[in-house]
Regions:
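Active-site beta-loop-alpha junctions of metal-dependent nucleic acid enzymes
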Residues: 71-95, 119
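Flexible loop/turn segments at secondary-structure boundaries
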Residues: 7, 45-48, 68-69, 78-81, ...
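Domain-scale segment recognizer with a strong primary affinity
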Residues: 5-8, 112-113, 127-255
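Acidic/histidine-rich, metal-coordinating catalytic segments
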Residues: 91-114
């Protein structure tokens, strides 16, 4: 009788556990950084260029293997801005094998644009070569909110802190150039996080340096130091824009 009683089932039933599948191959195989990349857009952020207040968006690209991130600023949410930002990312980080994203309109249209351009080529050999070498797009299932955690988790790391920081600062004195620099500073901070914890025993005479995504991207074991000086809240209203950015960067790091 208990299994047919709805009230008893709620009171005595065991909670349903989340069934997790194995990690995909792109998360476990050693490959060059950003060979498999997840992409998403976050924002918006209000900036003031000259006397005009505008909205800007952040484009996040994360490596599925090294968990490194790369940020770009989008002036709009249309396909043209996305393609230009994607091409600039590829010029910096190198070619991407697979690009994972949700079913955003700008992502889908960009995939169709690239495929249409290859089909319009007149030379068969060039068309065949590009069709095998170009980046392939992989979209998550529509209305599947449980998918895309690879990039959604990285967006949460940045968006929640950055949005709260800009609101608490109560300032709209940041222009697009300053926002770009701030996102790059945040990118460096996020990529400096260690993969695992490290322990330092008493018999060790050296400092144990943890492995970070920045080590894999730059092949250097030294972190970028901030510029010398003390940055305080009055710097938000300074005419020196670089001091505004450095103050916000220090606040982001402390949170």
């Amino acid at each position: 009788m208990i299994r047919h009683c709805a009230k008893c089932t709620k009171l005595r039933g065991n909670p349903v556990g989340q069934k997790m599948s194995n990690l995909p191959q792109c998360r476990t195989e050693p490959e060059a950084p950003f060979t498999h990349t997840g992409v998403d857009v976050f924002g918006s952020f209000k900036v003031k260029d000259y006397r005009k207040e505008c909205k800007r968006y952040g484009l996040l690209l994360t490596c599925t293997a090294s968990r490194a991130v790369h940020f770009k600023v989008l002036e709009d949410m249309n396909t043209d801005c996305y393609i230009n930002s994607l091409r600039s990312f590829l010029a910096i980080r190198g070619p991407v094998s697979v690009l994972y994203s949700d079913n955003g309109t700008n992502f889908v249209v960009a995939s169709n644009e690239f495929g249409k351009t290859v089909k319009e080529l007149s030379e068969p050999r060039i068309k065949e070569y590009l069709s095998t070498k170009q980046c392939s797009f992989s979209f998550s299932t529509p209305t599947a909110s449980h998918m895309g955690g690879t990039w959604e988790r990285m967006i949460r790391t940045v968006r929640n802190v950055l949005r709260g920081l800009l609101i608490e600062s109560n300032t709209n004195r940041i222009d697009t150039s300053s926002l770009c620099t701030l996102l790059y500073e945040c990118m460096h901070i996020v990529n400096s996080r260690p993969f695992t914890t490290t322990t330092l025993h008493s018999d060790q005479n050296f400092e144990s340096i943890p492995l970070t995504p920045n080590n894999l991207l730059t092949m250097k074991n030294k972190n970028l130091l901030p510029p010398p000086g003390s940055f305080t809240s009055p710097d938000l209203y300074s005419h020196k824009r670089w001091r505004r950015v450095q103050y916000l960067t220090e606040q982001f790091w402390s949170r």
